[in-house]
């Protein structure tokens, strides 16, 4: 069976330049590659034809022989053993077209970026609300100041890896394919350090603690994270440094609780003020302010003091302070006080005075109805 013309296989003219041939090969190789057509024998045979045509037409000597003698140039005795499969380097094609399949292409492995670091910072509520600048000390890896990150002894330079010749990749042939792998000798860096730095022992980085001044913006809360770009560990062999993340944890406050941008606090008042009303001082983060308590105030009533909360870290309106009233039962009464309270209770008409204690009346009426229903 006559073999198909190489130019026809690739779909190019006989005057096509090498770049046109490469372009045609990339397109066809992608289409008929066995990994994309598993089990398809026709596609596999087509791929072999495409590869054979490419190898001949991109070799100037083989192409000239083919143009003059056709396929006869590569038959036994035709060209002094030149034959197909003479070991052409397809790394330029495979590196571009099949980089993902064969280990990521031809390029040298990039030096690793430095690791990110985390620092847990505890703040008081006042610091979180107002903002604060704090100094912290963190252990990290910094660029070696002797070799400046190269890992080589001063006055020397890292040498090109003799295994991969500086590419960071080695080529392993498997059948028709040249498989690219990370060089095991230099771990993909493309260079070797023959004379390592005495301080960092060739690593390019040294362990060190550093002090940083961290500005905490006003309004942060537990769980917020502040990023300091480039303040993490130094990268390997000149690669970028990682980042430092400051994780905020706000301590519990003895008076205030925070929910979002609002603050809450409990304000105890005696039962006389709860009944008669009056004025008390309540704490805020800016100092004491007066709060008017109306008569007949019950435990649990909330009083809102606008703008006395927390300003959002993202800007916008300021939160409020909500004061929850707790009516205290008097303790440590003397005989006179007990007598006065007894007289007061009698003036109410007893423990369940209907007029002065509407909630008590409602409660006891409900209890009475419950037992009445049980006895019916």
Curated annotation (Swiss-Prot):
Question: Which cofactors does it use?
Answer: Zn(2+)
- Tell me which UniProt keywords the record has, alphabetically: Chaperone, Cytoplasm, DNA replication, Metal-binding, Repeat, Stress response, Zinc, Zinc-finger
Domain J, chain residue ranges per copy: 5-70
One biological process term in Gene Ontology: protein refolding
Which cysteines pair up through disulfides? They are: none
| PROSITE patterns linked | DNAJ_1, DNAJ_2, ZF_CR
Please state where this protein is localized: Cytoplasm
Q: Does the keyword Repeat apply?
A: yes
Q: Predominant location of this chain?
A: cytoplasm
The record's listing under InterPro entries reads: DnaJ, DnaJ_C, DnaJ_domain, DnaJ_domain_CS, HSP40/DnaJ_pept-bd, HSP_DnaJ_Cys-rich_dom, HSP_DnaJ_Cys-rich_dom_sf, J_dom_sf
- Pfam families under this entry? DnaJ, DnaJ_C, DnaJ_CXXCXGXG
Give me the CXXCXGXG motif repeat coordinates as residue ranges. Answer: 144-151, 161-168, 183-190, 197-204
Read off the domain note: The J domain is necessary and sufficient to stimulate DnaK ATPase activity. Zinc center 1 plays an important role in the autonomous, DnaK-independent chaperone activity of DnaJ. Zinc center 2 is essential for interaction with DnaK and for DnaJ activity.
**What is the protein name for this chain?**
Chaperone protein DnaJ
The taxonomy runs: Bacteria, Pseudomonadati, Pseudomonadota, Gammaproteobacteria, Enterobacterales
Q: Which gene encodes it?
A: dnaJ
